[in-house]
């Protein structure tokens, strides 16, 4: 919110400077055209001062509202650009990106998941034994939106397994030793699996957390940074310069317990330190309804 105010002040200052300059030029032109206009100035100085104050008050309100509207309407902030490569922070909803106007580039949308790539969603803890994926996480919302039936969830499991086999990913021996009762293989933090629930959507499932034997998620800032670097490496090798969209990770129900602002700064810093992997447009997505809690400026 503080940065939104700072941006508002910046826009406001620029508008003030422009309008004052314009008024100065206009006054000079009027004085040049009508040289006798100020001969009787002393006679009505009070009235002129009063009118001048009213004009500046009105001008202030106009500039303020224009600045406020400009701040509200601006949805993105490009923080780095070099040729056709860029890093941008945007206000948006990642689940609405695929349905927007199509362009020549694909959109690769990141979904943070666990190292087992679980697909069992917890909607009712009284009915689900050892619930895994919360419906309130991006992981859970993704599954419920695109794989709402048991047959579709089974198809998702198959798609994940086939992709893991295709890429030759091997189970993480350290995790397998740590959690010996795992019902599924566990893969390294930062493992990326691409799935395509519809013809016009491309999602990258990014492993950022581990589930223990009781299905409690465990993660950390170190896991987050490691997974982000792995994601950027994957993007560089596999996404052919198409657009990448990364949501804020490690907030809400995550065990990392980051604020939106903290998550944004970690993601931003990690990308800025690995720009050699950016060969397209990388977008950090802040949920559009969270404008009041985190600024993109």
What positions do the PLM features span?
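Macrodomain-like recognition of ADP-ribose-binding/processing modules
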Residues: 2-297
């Amino acid at each position: 919110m503080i940065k939104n105010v700072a941006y508002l002040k910046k826009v406001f200052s620029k508008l003030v400077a422009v309008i004052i300059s314009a008024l100065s030029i206009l006054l000079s032109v009027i004085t040049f055209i009508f040289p006798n206009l100020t001969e009787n100035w002393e006679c009505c100085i009070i009235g002129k001062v009063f009118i001048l104050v009213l004009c500046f008050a009105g001008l202030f309100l106009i500039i303020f509202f224009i600045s406020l509207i400009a701040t509200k309407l601006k949805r993105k902030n490009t923080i780095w650009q070099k040729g056709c490569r860029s890093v941008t922070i945007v206000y948006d909803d990642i689940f609405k990106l695929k349905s927007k106007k199509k362009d020549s580039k694909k959109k690769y949308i990141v979904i943070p998941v666990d190292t087992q790539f679980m697909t069992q969603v917890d909607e009712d803890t009284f009915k689900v034994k050892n619930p895994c994926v919360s419906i309130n996480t991006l992981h859970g919302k993704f599954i419920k939106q695109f794989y709402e039936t048991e047959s579709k969830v089974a198809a998702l499991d198959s798609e994940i397994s086939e992709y893991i086999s295709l890429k030759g990913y091997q189970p993480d021996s350290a995790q397998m030793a740590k959690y010996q009762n795992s019902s599924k293989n566990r893969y390294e933090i930062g493992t990326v699996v691409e799935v395509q629930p519809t013809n016009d959507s491309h999602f990258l499932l990014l492993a950022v957390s581990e589930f223990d034997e009781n299905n409690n998620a465990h993660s950390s800032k170190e896991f987050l940074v490691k997974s982000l670097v792995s994601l950027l490496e994957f993007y560089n090798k596999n996404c052919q310069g198409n657009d990448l969209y990364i949501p804020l990770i490690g907030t809400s129900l995550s065990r990392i317990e980051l604020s939106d602002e903290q998550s944004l700064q970690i993601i931003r810093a990690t990308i800025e330190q690995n720009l050699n992997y950016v060969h397209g447009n990388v977008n950090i997505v802040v949920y559009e309804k969270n404008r009041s809690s985190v600024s993109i400026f």
